[in-house]
């Protein structure tokens, strides 16, 4: 139950601010930097990537 709750919160954060959700899940790794770059190019690609990375 707690793991699914954490994933749900991470997904909500990923929708509001994609790099923040990825940062809380993976720290300052390559996933964060890719998400940050995609968010700068467009908000929607950042959201899609963040949700995909968090749920995989």
Swiss-Prot record:
Subcellular location: Membrane
Primary subcellular site in the record, as a coarse category: membrane
Keyword Zinc on entry: no
Residues annotated as transmembrane: 11-31, 34-54
Tissues of expression: Expressed in shoot of cold stressed seedlings.
An individual GO BP term: response to abscisic acid
InterPro entries registered for this protein in UniProt: PMP3
Membrane topology designation: Multi-pass membrane protein
Keywords: Membrane, Transmembrane, Transmembrane helix
Induction: Early induction by low temperature and abscisic acid (ABA). Late induction by drought and salt stresses.
GO annotation, cellular component aspect: membrane
Recorded family membership: Belongs to the UPF0057 (PMP3) family.
Function: Plays a role in the regulation of membrane potential. Could mediate a proton leak.
Name of the protein in its database record: Hydrophobic protein LTI6A
Organism field: Oryza sativa subsp. japonica
């Amino acid at each position: 139950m707690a793991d699914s709750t954490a994933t749900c919160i991470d997904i909500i954060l990923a929708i509001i601010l994609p790099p923040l959700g990825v940062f809380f899940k993976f720290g300052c790794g390559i996933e964060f930097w890719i998400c940050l770059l995609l968010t700068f190019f467009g908000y929607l690609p950042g959201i899609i990537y963040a949700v995909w990375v968090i749920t995989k």
